[in-house]
Curated annotation (Swiss-Prot):
Its EC number is 3.1.3.77. The keyword Thylakoid does not apply. Belongs to the HAD-like hydrolase superfamily. MasA/MtnC family. It holds the Pfam family Hydrolase. Mg(2+) binds at residues 18, 20, 209. Keywords: Amino-acid biosynthesis, Cytoplasm, Hydrolase, Magnesium, Metal-binding, Methionine biosynthesis, Nucleus. One of its GO terms (molecular function) is magnesium ion binding. This is Enolase-phosphatase E1. Monomer. Gene3D superfamilies: 1.10.720.60, HAD superfamily/HAD-like. Pathway: Amino-acid biosynthesis; L-methionine biosynthesis via salvage pathway; L-methionine from S-methyl-5-thio-alpha-D-ribose 1-phosphate: step 3/6; Amino-acid biosynthesis; L-methionine biosynthesis via salvage pathway; L-methionine from S-methyl-5-thio-alpha-D-ribose 1-phosphate: step 4/6. It comes from Naegleria gruberi (Amoeba). Its main location: cytoplasm. The keyword Magnesium applies.
Length: 252
């Protein structure tokens, strides 16, 4: 199916966006957010060591490291933390990032660091120009926008509040993530969104780069348009969704 034809979206009253690969380059997290943690970790630990927030972060990391040591998991060699040693915390965080762990304690610290990075201007949430323009066109039509991403609601809000196009939070009615809604590859998550918002499924258009998510949304009666961007997954030749390389191809 062609990814360049113009598609009318005038019948939809609500637009729900994925982030990575849709509004934002798919490499943004890997090439901007995670490198920021590695680059700023030592300074962050040194400068916030006495803060209650960092003390809680360190305690959570310490508890996880102790659980790892007493387990038979692949992480039983995780560096242990001495609460009097900043270097032990740094070593533990680097170890867990190298292992690409999704543990709560690590995500908590990273979230606090990203917040500081955004607030200080060291991180800007990258939003495609055509995505921003589409947000503008949607609002001019008096229609609503929601965000549904696997990234936490906090991370979503930081990206859009401190974006390359300024504070975009006023454009959005609400934010959904996998913790408050569920897995994006499951029909039940989209049913839950319909129940929570009270919006008829025929009124919503979902925009995502992931065909598996589009299939799950379709099972709940929600239409989707696939976002084809640099680095997004190649679509199967026989897929039956509309697809665009830019939101300028969507028109009212």
């Amino acid at each position: 199916m062609s990814a360049v034809k113009r598609i009318s979206v005038s019948k939809y009253k609500t637009f729900m966006f994925d982030i990575e690969g849709t509004t934002t380059p798919i490499v943004f997290v890997a090439e901007n957010l995670f490198p920021y943690i590695r680059k700023s970790l030592k300074t962050h630990i040194e400068e916030t060591w006495e803060s209650e927030e960092t003390k809680k972060d360190v305690l959570s990391l310490k508890e996880q490291a102790e659980q790892d040591a007493n387990s038979q998991s692949d992480f039983k060699d995780a560096p242990q933390i001495n609460i009097d040693s900043q270097q032990s915390v740094i070593d533990n965080v680097v170890y867990n990032m190298d292992k690409d762990r999704k543990m709560t304690a690590l995500k908590q610290l990273q979230g606090h660091m990203w917040r500081s990075g955004y607030e200080s201007g060291n991180i800007l949430g990258e939003v495609y120009d055509d995505a921003f323009d589409f947000f503008e066109r949607i609002k001019k039509q008096g229609k609503n926008i929601y965000i549904y991403s696997s990234g936490s609601v906090q991370a979503q809000k930081l990206l859009f509040q401190y974006s390359t196009h300024g504070n975009l939070l006023p454009y959005f009615v609400d934010h959904f993530d996998t913790s408050n809604i569920g897995n994006k590859l499951e029909k039940s998550s989209y049913v839950k969104i319909l129940e929570r918002t009270g919006i008829p499924n025929s009124d919503i258009l979902f925009l995502t780069d992931n065909i598996g998510e589009a299939i799950a949304a379709r099972e709940a009666g929600i239409d989707s348009v696939l976002s084809v961007r640099p680095g997004t997954m190649k679509l199967p030749e026989d897929h039956t969704f509309e697809a665009v390389t830019s939101f300028e191809h969507l028109e009212f």
